[in-house]
Amino acid sequence: MAPAARPTGLTPADHRAYGGLLADVHAACNAQDLDALGGLATPEMVEQFGDRFASDVYDVVTDVRLRRMRPVRVWSENGLDHATIHMRYSMTAVVCDGYGRVLHGARAGRVTVEESWTYVRCGRWLLEAIQPASGTRDRAARGTPAAGSFVRSAP
């Protein structure tokens, strides 16, 4: 594994963009809006979101709050800037079946999530990948909703 690049060249505006994308991606997933996701993520990520939207199991995610973020790796490749950002955020989240029955989670409780989101700058930053943070299990394995899961707004 190559060592992480030093986080140089990122500006406060870049950090605001990453936090904004966290909120915007969750909002677009809540609305099941692939068109909105097309302006927030790469075509490959939009395809993954679309595949998850077709599931009979979906997430209800509300009140996403970014707690901490730090650059993990920043690099340029083929003339494009990339950044992997470790994010810790909390949200209210439940996993429901197609009938709206809660399978996992509690509507009144908050869950804390740690993930690394990778972005690519194509004029503006776009979401390129989401990975569980090192040393943590995948949210799906814990029964915790994922940003890319089928997400509906809370009733």
Where are the language model's segments positioned?
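Core segments of small alpha/beta cavity-forming domains
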Residues: M1-S76, P155
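A generic structural signal for ordered secondary structure
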Residues: L22, A83, W125-L127
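Short, charged/polar low-complexity linear motifs in solvent-exposed/disordered segments
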Residues: A54-D56, V102, T144-A147
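Low-complexity, intrinsically disordered terminal/linker segments enriched in charged
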Residues: R107-P155
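Surface-exposed, charged secondary-structure patches
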Residues: V57-A106
